[in-house]
């Protein structure tokens, strides 16, 4: 079972922190064997944990002290429902209203197109089964291993040309970088039909 795939992280490149992978699986194993959490409930809480730990950078920085604190906290946890409640509590402390109102939008407005917040957005799109631009197929279909050989089956394209954005008053590099959509690679070589060509 691939917990990260079920949380929407269908490729290793979408996970910014390898520590998040290791310690999320450690928590999964502790929940399964130590606390005997039911399979359905355990998968649900660990998927939430994966999402929280990857987009907030939970395991970056002083990872050892964070993990030691977790293990110390778990000494006071004795039952399956307490284990789930503990993880929900840590998630809730990270995913506050302020996080969603201020921190996350600021992270998504970053000039980097490869931030943990952006990868979290892609993971959410995968989980929700959202179709790609100009396609009825979900984005997740194009992350399936072997779907397109070694070739990248997802391509990013700008929605509006940079010159047009500058003309209407947008001259911020963040806007230029975020002004894109994922489209299937096979369609990326096909030029979009203009109004003139469709009229003729």
What is each model feature region?
Residues 38-54:
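Short secondary-structure subsegments characteristic of cysteine-rich extracellular domains
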Residues 1-33:
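Polyanionic (Asp/Glu-rich) segments that form extended negatively charged tracts
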Residues 196-200:
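Domain-exit/linker segments immediately C-terminal to small folded modules
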Residues 54-164, 185:
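Intrinsically disordered, low-complexity N-proximal targeting/linker segments that flank membranes
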Residues 154, 166-192:
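Short beta-strand-alpha-helix junction that forms the catalytic/metal-binding core
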Residues 1, 45, 53, 79-80:
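Hydrophobic, aromatic-lined core segments that form the binding pocket/scaffold
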Residues 14-22, 40-43, 150, 180:
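Conserved structured core elements
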Residues 25, 43, 47, 157-160, ...:
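Generic hydrophobic alpha-helical scaffold/packing signal
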């Amino acid at each position: 079972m691939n917990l990260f795939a079920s949380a929407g992280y269908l490729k290793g490149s979408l996970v910014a922190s390898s520590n998040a992978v290791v310690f999320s699986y450690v928590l999964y194993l502790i929940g399964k064997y130590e606390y005997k959490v039911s399979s359905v409930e355990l998968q649900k809480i660990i998927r939430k944990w994966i999402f929280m730990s990857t987009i907030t950078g939970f395991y970056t920085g002083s990872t050892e002290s964070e993990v030691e604190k977790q293990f110390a906290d778990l000494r006071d946890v004795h039952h399956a429902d307490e284990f789930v409640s503990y993880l929900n509590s840590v998630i809730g402390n990270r995913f506050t209203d302020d996080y969603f109102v201020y921190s996350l939008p600021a992270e998504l407005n970053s000039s980097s197109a490869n931030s943990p917040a952006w990868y979290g957005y892609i993971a959410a799109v995968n989980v929700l089964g959202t179709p790609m631009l100009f396609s009825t197929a979900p984005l997740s279909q194009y992350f399936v291993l072997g779907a397109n050989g070694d070739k990248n089956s997802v391509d990013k394209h700008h929605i509006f040309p940079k010159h047009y954005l500058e003309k209407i008053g947008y001259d911020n590099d963040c806007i230029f970088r975020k002004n894109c959509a994922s489209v299937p690679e096979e369609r990326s070589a096909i030029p979009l039909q203009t109004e003139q060509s469709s009229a003729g």
